[in-house]
């Protein structure tokens, strides 16, 4: 009986060792980074070389990345060979898409992200790391559609990105940009709110949040002209600023801040009559506006 159990134990041990060796190769092939799921040693070797070439290219070219440069040509070649050796090698498609991203080869990048998504979606269980990569793939496809001005496609991909990874700040950022550009201001504001909730210091997020909020309040066209007017005023380009502020009140006759700054420009240029007229408009809309009241008195003093 003991011999029988010993024999069974030895057989099971051999089976387990065999399975572990396959598991180890399938899921940890590569450079000890992400799990690589391939049974092809050739594919794994090619991808390892491709990654090394990519990293060398990044260091060598310092941002001047073009697909015809030697190291990038080699990185692309080895990544493609990895895919030829195993067409379902998920990590190889991901890395090749990255290489195309670095070299600004947008069409091929989009193609590889699409293939990567197809392969990932076939998996029954997706690791947190794979989810982040999937979200990034959706984000890059969304950005590619944005570049082509395919805003419907862009929104769909970006929404998929934040569905997979709600903390994907870049996807929320571009949703905010796209929604603003097509006039969906409330959706844009919601996206900027999410960006700030994830990262309060995300570059320009506060600016866009304020811009969209004011666009909702005053009207997109009116606020766009108002903002342009203020920037021109800061540069002391008064004629151009006057034109922009006048456009702002044309789109929104109740835009008190535009009237206020028109008054300031006319006052600084010595046109006290026009200055007073614009500050009266401010007070008509906002009777308690103390700044307009003060400046109106100053203009009227100059007219006496």
PLM regions and their residue ranges:
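Register position in tetratricopeptide repeats
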Residues: 102, 140, 147, 181-182, ...
């Amino acid at each position: 009986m003991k011999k029988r159990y010993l024999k069974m134990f030895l057989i099971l041990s051999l089976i387990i060792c065999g399975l572990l060796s396959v598991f180890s190769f399938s899921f940890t092939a590569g450079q000890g980074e992400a799990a690589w799921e391939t049974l092809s040693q050739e594919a794994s070797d090619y991808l390892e070389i491709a990654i090394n070439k990519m990293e060398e290219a990044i260091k060598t070219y310092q941002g001047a990345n073009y697909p015809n440069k030697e190291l990038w040509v080699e990185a692309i070649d080895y990544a493609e060979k990895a895919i030829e050796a195993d067409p379902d090698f998920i990590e190889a498609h991901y890395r090749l898409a990255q290489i195309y991203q670095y070299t600004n080869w947008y069409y091929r990048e989009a193609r590889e992200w699409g293939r990567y998504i197809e392969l990932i979606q076939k998996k029954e269980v997706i690791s947190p790391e794979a989810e982040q990569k999937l979200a990034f793939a959706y984000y890059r496809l969304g950005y590619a559609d944005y570049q082509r001005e395919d805003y419907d496609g862009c929104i769909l991909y970006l929404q998929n990105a934040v569905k997979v990874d709600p903390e994907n700040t870049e996807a929320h950022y571009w949703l905010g940009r796209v929604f603003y550009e097509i006039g969906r201001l409330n959706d844009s504001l919601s996206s900027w709110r999410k960006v700030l909730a994830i990262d309060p210091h995300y570059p320009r997020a506060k600016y866009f949040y304020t811009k969209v909020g004011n666009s909702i309040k005053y009207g997109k066209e009116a606020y766009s002209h108002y903002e342009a007017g203020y920037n021109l005023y800061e540069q002391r380009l008064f004629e151009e600023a006057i034109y922009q502020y006048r456009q702002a009140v044309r789109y929104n006759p109740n835009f008190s801040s535009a009237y206020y700054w028109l008054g300031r420009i006319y006052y600084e240029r010595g046109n006290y009559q026009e200055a007073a007229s614009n500050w009266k408009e401010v007070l008509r809309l906002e009777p308690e506006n103390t700044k307009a009241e003060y400046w109106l008195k100053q203009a009227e003093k100059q007219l006496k």
